[in-house]
């Protein structure tokens, strides 16, 4: 049974058990039989199919497979939300909201999402005064959310590690990009990163999956990180044994360098306050999962 036509899920669990009073939208292209979906608790078919969905509903009403009173009920359920949201928009026009409060909540959510995967010799948390080299494109331009249908507008400009490290108590000896996301290895960038790594107590490498490596609408054919990042981590561990890799990704990855780094922290897609959340974990202000 397709999810969008599953009465047990949409009616018996969602409405009867959970008390849901909103409306159900199909996944994009996830509607198989719109009339059957409406019969079993679905409301909107997305993306719009022109008039074909409407014709299916009219045909189902005429042949009795979709009772008109059920269609009326779905319309009432949908319109209840439409009217309520319209009124909320009118009532809220011109009102202000707590931007900093939202940002603080985003930071707390990110902090509680961070997972510590490796911590050899208790390299973490980093003590105040630790000299760190910050390496990686993700440190300057974080991948803080997904794309496509999951894209949302942050309440303020998303942070980067470079924005928050000054208040962390750590001493940043250098920042180097190290690699270009979505590109092949760049020898010049990698060389500069390796040189910076030689002069640090600890090297923080910010790596992970870029916007092309994982996305909606496709299945990954492998679990590798981009070659440029794996090669960079290998080169850095050859000149400094105190390496912590900070990951940003929405899914699982292979870590061929696992045995050669001392720390691995997974921040997933940390949202607009993900950088300060990660810094709080790295410096011990917050305990990771």
PLM-predicted stretches and their roles:
Residues 1-7, 11-19, 25-34, 52-65, ...:
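C-terminal non-catalytic regions of proteins with extracellular/luminal or membrane-system context
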Residues 21-23, 43-44:
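Structural preference for beta-strand elements that scaffold enzyme active sites
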Residues 31, 36-39, 47:
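Conserved phosphate-binding loops in nucleotide/dinucleotide-binding enzymes
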Residues 40-46, 53, 61:
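Mobile "lid/hinge" segments at catalytic clefts and subdomain interfaces of large enzymes
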Residues 41, 59-89:
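Long, well-ordered, tryptophan-enriched scaffold segments
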Residues 49-50, 73-74, 89-95, 125-128:
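Short coil/turn segments at secondary-structure boundaries
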Residues 49-51, 78-90, 134, 168-169:
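Short, compositionally biased low-complexity segments
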Residues 69, 80-113:
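Helix-enriched interaction subdomains in cytosolic or periplasmic regions
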């Amino acid at each position: 049974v397709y999810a969008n036509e599953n009465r047990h899920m949409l009616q018996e669990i969602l409405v009867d058990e959970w008390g849901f009073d909103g409306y159900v939208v199909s996944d994009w292209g996830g509607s198989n039989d719109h009339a059957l979906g409406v019969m079993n608790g679905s409301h909107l078919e997305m993306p719009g199919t022109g008039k074909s969905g409407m014709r299916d509903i009219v045909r189902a009403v005429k042949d009795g497979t979709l009772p008109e009173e059920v269609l009326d009920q779905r319309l009432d359920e949908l319109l209840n939300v439409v009217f309520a949201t319209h009124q909320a928009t009118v009532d809220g026009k011109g009102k202000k909201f707590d931007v900093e409060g939202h940002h603080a909540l985003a930071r707390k959510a990110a902090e509680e999402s961070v997972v510590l995967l490796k911590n050899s010799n208790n390299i973490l948390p980093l003590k105040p005064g630790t000299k760190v080299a910050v390496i990686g494109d993700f440190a300057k331009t974080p991948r803080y959310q997904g794309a496509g249908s999951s894209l949302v507008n942050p309440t303020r400009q998303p942070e980067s590690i470079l924005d928050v490290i000054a208040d962390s108590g750590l001493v940043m000896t250098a920042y180097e990009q190290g690699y270009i996301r979505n590109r092949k290895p760049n020898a010049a960038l990698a060389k500069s990163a390796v040189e910076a790594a030689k002069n640090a107590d600890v090297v923080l490498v910010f790596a992970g999956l870029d916007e092309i490596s994982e996305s909606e609408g496709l299945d990954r054919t492998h679990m590798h990180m981009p070659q440029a990042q794996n090669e960079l981590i290998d080169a850095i561990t050859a000149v400094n044994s105190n390496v912590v890799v900070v990951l940003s990704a929405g899914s699982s990855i292979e870590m061929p360098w696992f045995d050669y780094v001392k720390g691995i922290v997974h921040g997933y897609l940390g949202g607009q306050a993900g950088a300060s959340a990660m810094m709080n974990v790295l410096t011990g202000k917050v305990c990771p999962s």
